Amino acid sequence: MSKKLFIQTLGCAMNVRDSEHIIAELSQKEDYTLTQNLEEADLILINTCSVREKPVHKLFSEVGAFEKAKKNGAKIGVCGCTASHLGDEIFKRAPYVDFVLGARNVSKISTAVKTPKFISTDINHDESEYAFGEFRGSPYKSHINISIGCDKKCTYCIVPHTRGDEISIPANLILREVEKAATNGAKEIFLLGQNVNNYGKRFSGAHEKIDFSDLLVRISEVAGVERIRFTSPHPLHMDDKFLEIFSQNPKICKSMHMPLQSGNTKVLREMKRGYTKEWFLDRAAKLREMCPDVSISTDIIVAFPGESDAEFEDTMDVLERVKFEQIFSFKYSPRPMTKAAEFTNQIDEATASARLTRLQSRHNEILDEIVAAQEGKILDVYFEELRANGGVAGRSFNNFLVQVNGSEELLGRTLKVKITDTKRMVLYGELAN
């Protein structure tokens, strides 16, 4: 009789793909099937994030709830980035946890579920970490890792300590996975890496040397692939070749994530980001010039240690000049093992909160203007989700969330939609064809 697996995923798209890898491994080798019912689960997993302090606190509140809800004999496992940096401390704080797997150790999940108090948190450079069977959370798109880890060592970021140095996955393995996904019906390919456009700088062995721009072209040539998305690129590596291929290739979706973090050059230097305010503005302007329909999203940290009022105003200036379609903004959160956590000039909570509120309020005003301008336009929308209110939703080519009245027969299809109404985060429309 098949065993039941319940899995909760916190954090980024990399974690989503790691969870898909875990599900594939357990279903193929250990006869587990996925369940959404916690109470019937034989195995309960939480795949964790540690990029800020809040998700770490959430881990322990969640596993505490799992311990109360689990049926007799059910096992609880903690995976992901928090597992990497806390290690066996998780057992001390939550003794009912049965095993701990770091972010670079998910290939050991079969061993973990069969071994009492199993723990593995070392940085694994073995190619087994990305040679998993196929499982997709959505039949209409496929998340595919092209690299693992990060070399940037930004002073605020824990990721290099939890996911290790950057290793590119060989192009032949990526293309094989793309072909498999397309054959199985995924028309959209979503490429993942901490710095995707740094792809090709280091492999774990002797492999074909290829950069990210050329990899995008190769993937676009795979039969059945209609759309390509990726996250996250680094502004430092947005050279003209990359921007040209992004702008001109008809299969690459016209949405670009450009993580700003700060609009002040001094703060960027202390963050160890490697670029200046002027470089970022130049790349954003070049992108909008080459690709007028592009939507640009970004990450912003306010109240980085030592950030003055004037330096924060530089961030507001970039917000005004680029007019991002979407921002992911947070107060600086000190992380263990990072340089910035040792800085003595931390910003007080009141100042940090005020800056975040101002940033988000102004962006909401910008977003309202951007969204209102979509009304009356006809957008190509790839439908992939049934909504609870009875509609069908998908993403436009430039990443707007669009909803229409319809049924599941629309899923997996790209159709033209005329936008008839707008809300801050959703466009509403009717089929134009």
Swiss-Prot record:
Catalytic activity: N(6)-dimethylallyladenosine(37) in tRNA + (sulfur carrier)-SH + AH2 + 2 S-adenosyl-L-methionine = 2-methylsulfanyl-N(6)-dimethylallyladenosine(37) in tRNA + (sulfur carrier)-H + 5'-deoxyadenosine + L-methionine + A + S-adenosyl-L-homocysteine + 2 H(+)
Domain Radical SAM core, residue spans: 136-369
Cofactor remark from the record: Binds 2 [4Fe-4S] clusters. One cluster is coordinated with 3 cysteines and an exchangeable S-adenosyl-L-methionine.
Superkingdom of source: Bacteria
UniProt xrefs under SMART domains: Elp3
Domain TRAM, residue spans: 372-433
tRNA processing recorded as keyword: yes
Residues annotated for [4Fe-4S] cluster 1 binding in this entry: 12, 49, 81
Entry's Gene Ontology cellular component terms: cytosol
Localization (cell): Cytoplasm
GO molecular-function terms, A-Z: 4 iron, 4 sulfur cluster binding; metal ion binding; N6-isopentenyladenosine methylthiotransferase activity
Enzyme class: transferase
Coiled-coil spans in chain: none
Binding site for [4Fe-4S] cluster 2: 150, 154, 157
UniProt KW keywords: 4Fe-4S, Cytoplasm, Iron, Iron-sulfur, Metal-binding, S-adenosyl-L-methionine, Transferase, tRNA processing
Keyword Signal applies: no
Cofactors that this protein relies on: [4Fe-4S] cluster
Quaternary state and interactors: Monomer.
Family membership noted in the UniProt record: Belongs to the methylthiotransferase family. MiaB subfamily.
Stated name of the protein: tRNA-2-methylthio-N(6)-dimethylallyladenosine synthase
Biological source species: Campylobacter curvus (strain 525.92)
Gene: miaB
